UniProtKB/Swiss-Prot annotation:
GO MF terms, alphabetically ordered: lipid binding
InterPro entries: DegV, DegV_C, DegV_domain_contain
UniProt: hexadecanoate binding residues: T60, S93
Classification lineage: Bacteria, Bacillati, Bacillota, Bacilli, Lactobacillales
Protein's name in the database: DegV domain-containing protein YqaC
Function: May bind long-chain fatty acids, such as palmitate, and may play a role in lipid transport or fatty acid metabolism.
Keywords attached to this entry: Lipid-binding
Keyword Cell cycle: no
Pfam family, one: DegV
């Protein structure tokens, strides 16, 4: 088996995997104030600076289907026998529906695009797991089974500080954002079972929201040693450190602080903090 793994630039994974020859990343076009940016050439912090200074709402669009089609044809010519594509959830992006037909277009390759239901670091962690298993010589069917097990065990909760970013992204009405701000509501967001970002609970004050997120962490990960924990933020270092310290104090032994990439940060806004848990590799 010769396996290629394809993902998109919403996935965040460890630096070492960027050198893997069988990993391919599709760019999600993104722009601020009419200027397009290459996500492979801009750091998270540089993007946050652009967000803070932007006159208009940053805009994202789908990866190009033609680009994926060309890549798949090249992979077939290179002798790849299997392709696994792990992309933004269908509930977030129409890309998944647009590329679904490509799974049956290649006679010499088995092409599979399973639903992921999550993004950011948890999606990147699934990419890492698949690459590790392929490197170890694990069969394709077993890799798919492990991916599904990890995906179905993923959970993520987010504290959004400024509701106006959600309103700008179309996930909350302007009226609701204004009212929520006046009432000091700091909602807990999550990914639904279909992969849609939705309000899990409406909580007043940051302190209460942070407390609720800690409760949810313990509820979802009853065996701390069985899970990888990502604490993810957009310039919310103090809150991220608080969640990190709490996770360690509760017996989690694989906890990492990371930052949201531009695609997700654009929708959640600055000063957002989250955690994502994934069953370990």
């Amino acid at each position: 088996m010769k396996l290629a793994v394809i993902t998109d630039s919403s996935a965040d994974f460890a630096e070492k995997y960027k050198t893997y020859e069988n990993l391919f990343v599709l760019d999600i076009p993104i722009s601020i104030d009419g200027v397009d940016y290459d996500l492979q050439k801009i750091s998270h912090e540089e993007w946050y600076d652009l967000m803070a200074e932007a006159q208009e709402v940053p805009k994202t669009s789908q990866p190009r289907v033609a680009e994926l089609d060309r890549l798949l044809k090249d992979l077939e010519k290179q002798g790849y026998t299997h392709v696994l594509g792990l992309f933004l959830p269908a509930a977030i992006s129409g890309f998944y529906q647009n590329i679904f037909y490509l799974q049956s277009e290649y006679e010499q390759m088995k092409v599979v695009f399973p639903e992921t239901f999550i993004t950011s670091s948890p999606l990147g962690y699934m990419v890492e797991t698949v690459l590790d298993l392929a490197e170890a010589g694990v069969e394709f069917e077993e890799i798919i089974a492990k991916f599904e097990e990890q995906r179905d065990g993923d959970r993520a909760y987010m504290l959004v500080d400024d509701l106006h970013w959600l309103a700008k992204g179309g996930r909350l009405s302007n009226g609701a954002a204004v009212l929520g701000t006046l009432l000091n509501i700091k909602p807990v967001l999550t990914f639904s079972t279909e992969g849609k970002v939705e309000v899990f609970e409406k909580v007043r004050t940051v302190k209460k929201t942070m407390s609720r997120m800690k409760e949810l962490l313990l509820k979802d990960a009853k065996d701390p040693l069985a899970y990888k924990v990502y604490v993810i933020h957009t310039r919310a270092e103090d809150r991220a450190q608080e969640l990190y310290d709490y996770a360690l104090s509760q017996g989690f032994d694989d906890v990492e602080i990371v930052t949201f990439g531009p695609v997700i940060a654009t929708h959640l806004g600055l000063n957002t903090v989250a955690y994502g848990i994934s069953p370990k590799k």
